[in-house]
Regions:
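Extended, non-catalytic subsegments within catalytic or DNA/protein-binding/adaptor domains
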Residues: 69, 132-133, 225-228, 239
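A short glycine-rich beta-strand->turn/loop micro-motif centered on a GG-aromatic cluster
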Residues: 53-55
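N-terminal Rossmann-like NAD(P) cofactor-binding module of classical short-chain dehydrogenase/reductase
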Residues: 16-25, 51
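Glycosyltransferases and closely related glycan-assembly transferases
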Residues: 37-45
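Oxidoreductase cofactor-interface core, primarily capturing Rossmann-like NAD(P)-dependent enzymes
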Residues: 1, 7-15, 28-32, 44-48, ...
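Non-catalytic, hydrophobic alpha-helical segments
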Residues: 22, 136, 168, 242-245
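Amphipathic terminal alpha-helices
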Residues: 227-250
């Protein structure tokens, strides 16, 4: 275990000199400070791959409004810095963490999936991607020494985990054997709610708008020039499907 302080350049360089790969998992508050990691990697000169703290939407292909837009812009700016410095990288676009959204079907303030009513942002047709956190970790480690992921975006977008909100609700209804009352929230109302909501509700809503209304996780094709898809690269990995994941809540 190598120790280094994000805010102590010398200690960071010393730690990074002992490794070949740097995977950053800093939280929201430190996203902008990853430039310090880039500077240390540049000075150390030995790192073969850097994975910045991404693990969400592809920040170069988003239609997010504030306040999510600022967080995405911070990540995008770091990408440009990494590229300008010539540091070998992989950006992991893992889309949604299943554990954050599926236990409640993304219902605000809920502690369990809905049994009577469900709120759906937009018309429910935009497709989103839900991946179990363990599987995201597995795919990330697989990518570490894979030349196919070098200087590429690794999208974790298995077809069986790519569902519209309507698909998700239908799947859940089949499992519990009943039909839910559906409340569709039009985009104009979603945007109004974002502007009026306090932190962190406005952040969550703006991410929901980006994904469930604008379809930012799936409204583009993965082109070989910039990206690869994890379940295609590693068909041997047995990942948890959304269908399987929801069984624990029935």
């Amino acid at each position: 275990m190598q120790q280094g302080d994000l805010y102590d350049h010398e200690s960071l360089v010393k730690a990074i000199k002992q490794v070949d790969v740097v995977i950053s998992t800093v939280g929201h508050g430190q996203l902008g400070d990853q430039g310090k990691i880039v500077a240390a990697i540049k000075e150390a000169g030995n790192v073969k791959r850097f994975f910045p703290s991404e693990f969400g939407n592809d920040v170069d292909r988003t239609h997010a409004v504030e306040p999510a837009a600022t967080a995405y812009a911070t990540k995008a700016q770091l990408r440009r810095t990494i590229e300008a410095e010539g540091i070998p990288y992989t950006y992991v676009s893992s889309n949604f963490f299943a554990g954050y959204f599926l236990p409640t079907l993304a219902q605000a303030g809920a502690t369990a999936p809905p049994r009577e009513k469900v709120v759906i942002l937009g018309d429910g047709t935009a497709k989103a991607v839900f991946n179990k956190e363990d599987d995201i970790g597995t795919y990330t480690i697989k990518a570490v020494e894979d030349p196919r992921t070098l200087n590429k975006i690794l999208y974790i977008r298995p077809p069986s985990n790519t569902l519209s909100f309507n698909d998700l609700v239908t799947l859940w209804e089949k499992k519990i054997g009943k039909t839910l009352e559906k409340n569709y929230v039009p985009e104009e109302e979603v945007l109004k709610n974002i502007q009026e909501a306090p932190i962190p509700v406005n952040v969550i809503l703006s991410i929901g708008h980006s994904v469930f209304v604008k379809g930012d996780q799936t409204n583009f094709d993965i082109e070989p020039s910039f990206g690869v898809e994890a379940s295609e690269l590693y068909p041997d990995v047995k990942f948890t499907t959304v269908d399987e994941y929801l069984n624990q809540f029935v």
